[in-house]
Amino acid sequence: MSSKEHTSEEPWQGFYGPNLGVAVELYEEYQKDPNAVDDELREAFEKWGPPPATAPERTQSTFTAASITDPDVIKKFVGAVKLADHIRAFGHLAADIQPILKEQRREDMFDLDRFGLTESDIRSVPVDLLCPYAPAHVKNGLDAINHLKEVYTKTIAFEFVHVTDEEERKWLNRMIESGLYLPNLSTEQRKSLLKRLTDVEGFEKFLHRTFVGQKRFSIEGLDTLVPMLDEVVREAVHEGTTNVMIGMAHRGRLNVLAHVLNKPYEMIFAEFLHSLNKDLFPSEGSIGINYGWTGDVKYHLGADRQIRDENTAEARLTLANNPSHLEFVSPIVEGYARAAQEDRTSPGAPEQDIMKAYSILIHGDAAFPGQGVVTETLNLSRLTGYQTGGSLHIIANNNIGFTTETFDSRSTLYSSDPAKGFEIPIVHVNADDPEACLAAVHLAFQYRKRFKKDFLIDLIGYRRFGHNEMDEPAVTQPGVYQIIRKHPTVRELYSKQLVKKGLIDEQTVKQLDDEVQDKLQSVYEETLRNRTDEHLPDTPPVEVVNGLPKLDTGVQSETLKAINNELLEWPESFSVNPKLEKILKRRLNVFDGDGKVDWALAETLAFATILHDGTPIRLTGQDSERGTFAHRHLVLHDSRTNDVHSPLQSFRHANASFAVHNSPLSEMAIVGFEYGYNVFAPETLVLWEAQFGDFANGAQVMFDQWVSAGRAKWGQKSGLVCLLPHGYEGQGPEHSSARLERFLVLAAENNWTIANCTSAAQYFHILRRQAAILNTDSVRPLIMMTPKSLLRNQKVASSVEELTTGRFKTVLEQPNLGESHEKVERIVLCSGKIAIDLQDRIEKEADKDWDWVHIVRVEQLYPFPKEPLQEIFARYPNVKEIVWSQEEPRNMGAWPFVQSKIRRAAPNGINVRYEGRTYRSSPAEGDPIIHKQEQERIVTETLTR
């Protein structure tokens, strides 16, 4: 065989001498008139182009040297090549990949008469023409076709014609058709595999028998998933991977926890007995299993373990915590992997080493095509800011979703079909063939190692019981479950196979099973002896209960000035857009005289000082490099060459990395990714910015299930910062509201901080405070309503002195107002942009007497600043009422959350009332004129006696 790689896309390699001459002559006829040759030849010429002037060098051919001048013979060759291509492309349709639904096979697809061929025709075709990577036993064309059928239509099948990269397709052809990907298991390895399957099955049987009727979401029918995970983890660690991350739903999770993560059986049994002995558990944050104070059901919990291979290589294996929201853990695990791959200890962009971490995502067959977050996550796989060098996707395919069958759950032939749009190679494998399953995993890992791309395995099995163990599946799928109940388990099938080969005897098989059951029974009895009937509710850690520490976050003026000057130095040859350069250079004057620091500069200075302190930063979002409102400009573009320059990545005094990326048009996957990144890199200030805050609800599942509650459920800390542009400016219901009320309704137990700042200095200080609490027990997410039109408003800009001293203030009092304490009758509380609108009115009507009113801005809405407000209230003895003023409708914004808190903070007998929009189903008006009228009304009524 030639040393050059060939595929069936190079069909002319089988022609030489006179035969090649005939092909050349026919091609010349085709060029003159395509209709002058037969349909098959025309199709061949269209697909493969002209024959070469000379045939490629050959080292093997079964073709005789006899001259061929008959075009019919060429037609036979073309037909044979077409057959070979069809086997490669459509062999999966005839493959034995369904353990239960055998009738789906289309075994007659490759009958020779369908292609106008006989065995004699094919036998004369050179092997190289049909299967250039065939093993030595393939002697002629017929052998080659039979070999291809053996390769592509048995218990493992392949789809990769949708992969456009020729090198990848050639590699896959070679690996598959040569058999290089197949495991060469020794007798001991086969026995070990049987032992593993016995562990998996025995565990499920024990749970089923011991904890009757309790939910466990059994793996039975997909038992081979566990040895597959064993194998891929082994290969990854052997290749130097130091972090392997797994994301999966509840199906089979307990088995994976027990056998892949090594979660002790006694812990799992204790969870079934509702008698957890927490004294046995590792402390929060250590490698092991963490529990929050409210906890979660056993089949949602994650775990960590340290693993070591035979070469003493060490790695961390992580199974991510996961709620019942199927597939949403996928981008979180990708964030884990990216965080583990990056070195953030040096200035500049983080340095990524993809071999440091490998992500494995286990999907459900109904959820993979059903949940949009799947394709959002797949879309990240090749993006600069999000790629992780290839993930392994495994669809745990039991051909059903609860009670919904495939014809009601997807519009595609396979549940894996959405992956084709991302050119991900797909392997379908019968879960009843454990050795084929290991082969699929090996191929997947080798592909990732070589091409640094995703790979998908469709593990096709069945579900032995109902969706959960209290469900009776025969009610809705009676026919299928008649078959399943008679179907032997994969352990039974594999043990019989080994017995038949003489590798093991039946007595040893039974002994393995007995040993597993004896061990489980012994552990269970020990668990019963140690059980406790105490069910005391846990409480949050004291660091959470006590709230955030009071930290001075000011930075010396000289330091800020030096940083500012350095960030405005660009490479000599770099040409910034002239208009932008003029705007940015104005920042040079900020530190001279009475200069003001606007919002964007305050952010940049905060970032620079945080980097100087040694804290890495990662900022992503749609248009975040420039900023939606053209205010940030953290990445500059050369107006002549389109080269880019990020001043913060060139900052000489940084002691950690800085990353900023424009994200794809996605909220769900991106918020999940950034949350995962921050969880795995807790020392990093990770910020996600919505294009407009209105679009943050595209990630509502992430906020509900992870960001707000992850620590309470799982002990999973996060310091993620979410920047949500918010404010009513006449832009309609889709560009006004970040749905502040939704974040406030989730606020409890000091789970996160919610702020709406009205000055650049406040933003500077809150960012620095957030960076200071990272990787401590006081850490929590920060949800920030950020400005839009106020970004350039001078009333929001701050003096340099405000950045150099003090700290973030939870409340701000309106300057030059409320100075006559005895005269104040009304205190107006507000938050965000409405405060600036009120200030504008007072300044516009400065000739009026405003001594009767005082305005207080609530900069931090949660935790609610009760004590600071009470101190303010106490200064005004003649106050008659406290008014909460807001832009948002009455059933939205902060009012539904703060009204009871204000009443509890207010002096006895003081009326607390509301000013703002009325109750609405839509957050804002679409007509800018009506918007303006409403804004004017709110301001007027708030400031009218």
From Swiss-Prot:
<dbReference type="InterPro" id="IPR023784">
    <property type="entry name" value="2oxoglutarate_DH_E1_bac"/>
</dbReference>
<dbReference type="Pfam" id="PF02779">
    <property type="entry name" value="Transket_pyr"/>
</dbReference>
<dbReference type="Pfam" id="PF16870">
    <property type="entry name" value="OxoGdeHyase_C"/>
</dbReference>
<dbReference type="GO" id="GO:0006096">
    <property type="term" value="P:glycolytic process"/>
</dbReference>
<keyword id="KW-0560">Oxidoreductase</keyword>
<dbReference type="GO" id="GO:0005829">
    <property type="term" value="C:cytosol"/>
</dbReference>
<keyword id="KW-0786">Thiamine pyrophosphate</keyword>
<dbReference type="InterPro" id="IPR011603">
    <property type="entry name" value="2oxoglutarate_DH_E1"/>
</dbReference>
<dbReference type="InterPro" id="IPR029061">
    <property type="entry name" value="THDP-binding"/>
</dbReference>
<dbReference type="InterPro" id="IPR031717">
    <property type="entry name" value="ODO-1/KGD_C"/>
</dbReference>
<keyword id="KW-0324">Glycolysis</keyword>
<dbReference type="GO" id="GO:0004591">
    <property type="term" value="F:oxoglutarate dehydrogenase (succinyl-transferring) activity"/>
</dbReference>
<comment type="similarity">
    <text>Belongs to the alpha-ketoglutarate dehydrogenase family.</text>
</comment>
<dbReference type="Pfam" id="PF00676">
    <property type="entry name" value="E1_dh"/>
</dbReference>
<dbReference type="InterPro" id="IPR042179">
    <property type="entry name" value="KGD_C_sf"/>
</dbReference>
<protein>
    <recommendedName>
        <fullName>2-oxoglutarate dehydrogenase E1 component</fullName>
        <ecNumber>1.2.4.2</ecNumber>
    </recommendedName>
</protein>
<dbReference type="InterPro" id="IPR005475">
    <property type="entry name" value="Transketolase-like_Pyr-bd"/>
</dbReference>
<dbReference type="GO" id="GO:0006099">
    <property type="term" value="P:tricarboxylic acid cycle"/>
</dbReference>
<dbReference type="GO" id="GO:0030976">
    <property type="term" value="F:thiamine pyrophosphate binding"/>
</dbReference>
<comment type="function">
    <text>E1 component of the 2-oxoglutarate dehydrogenase (OGDH) complex which catalyzes the decarboxylation of 2-oxoglutarate, the first step in the conversion of 2-oxoglutarate to succinyl-CoA and CO(2).</text>
</comment>
<dbReference type="InterPro" id="IPR001017">
    <property type="entry name" value="DH_E1"/>
</dbReference>
<comment type="subunit">
    <text>Homodimer. Part of the 2-oxoglutarate dehydrogenase (OGDH) complex composed of E1 (2-oxoglutarate dehydrogenase), E2 (dihydrolipoamide succinyltransferase) and E3 (dihydrolipoamide dehydrogenase); the complex contains multiple copies of the three enzymatic components (E1, E2 and E3).</text>
</comment>
<dbReference type="GO" id="GO:0045252">
    <property type="term" value="C:oxoglutarate dehydrogenase complex"/>
</dbReference>
